[in-house]
């Protein structure tokens, strides 16, 4: 089974994906980490993440070890990720990696921006998480503060809005829900509630007679 989860930054994709992978015994890939790794590599070399040549070269040389970098959760890597993700050459270089992961047994949960539309268009089930920029900014601030990092709400909100614009406005694989995705507005839902809805949706899709005992 392949589960695709898409949505804007800080919408709760990662939390839901990790919980579903654990619940159903599937592999999990945070595809955002791949783009963060590329962005971090470009920054480390002193290059501009918006430069197609530098970013594509970094994507083509990416290894699994790069996904273990300590700086991937930084805001600098996150901002760089959004910039490199808008470059067609980067997306092409990373597409095969993601598709190979998804096809590996026993199945996988992938979260990102274009999983249901580009990476795994034939995924068994797709979710698209929605949340206002203000709610997402508050969540991100709490996440950063919980990690002991300084975070200013206005700055985080501005960054999220800029990333939303880049993600939805890029010409290659723009952020948008797949036509067959289940859309979940998480503004008023906590992680547990979102997980419960997703599990029920999956079980109803694949085991319609489960509740009746058939």
Where are these regions (language model features)?
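Conserved lysine of the Walker
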Residues: 13
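ATP-dependent small-molecule kinase phosphotransfer cores
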Residues: 33-107, 117, 134-138, 142, ...
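Phosphate-binding beta-loop-alpha motif at adenosine-nucleotide cofactor sites
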Residues: 125, 176-191
């Amino acid at each position: 089974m392949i589960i695709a989860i898409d949505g804007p930054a800080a919408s709760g994709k990662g939390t839901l994906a990790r919980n579903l992978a654990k619940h159903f015994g599937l592999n999990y890939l945070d595809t955002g980490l791949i783009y963060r790794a590329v962005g971090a590599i470009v920054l480390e070399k002193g290059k501009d993440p918006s430069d197609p040549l530098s970013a594509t070269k970094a994507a083509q040389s990416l290894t699994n070890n790069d996904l273990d970098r300590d700086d991937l959760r930084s805001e600098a890597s996150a901002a760089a990720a959004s910039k490199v993700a808008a470059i067609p050459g980067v997306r092409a270089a990373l597409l095969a990696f993601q598709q190979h992961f998804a096809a590996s047994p026993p199945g996988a949960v992938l979260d990102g921006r274009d999983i249901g539309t580009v990476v795994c268009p034939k995924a068994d089930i797709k979710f698209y998480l929605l949340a206002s920029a203000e709610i997402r900014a508050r969540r991100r601030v709490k996440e950063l503060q919980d990690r002991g990092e300084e975070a200013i709400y206005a700055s985080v909100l501005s960054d999220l809005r800029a990333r939303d614009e880049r993600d939805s406005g890029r010409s290659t694989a723009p952020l948008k829900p797949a036509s067959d995705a289940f859309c979940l507005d998480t503004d008023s839902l906590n992680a547990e509630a979102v997980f419960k809805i997703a599990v029920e949706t999956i079980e109803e899709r694949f085991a319609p007679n489960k509740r009746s005992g058939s």
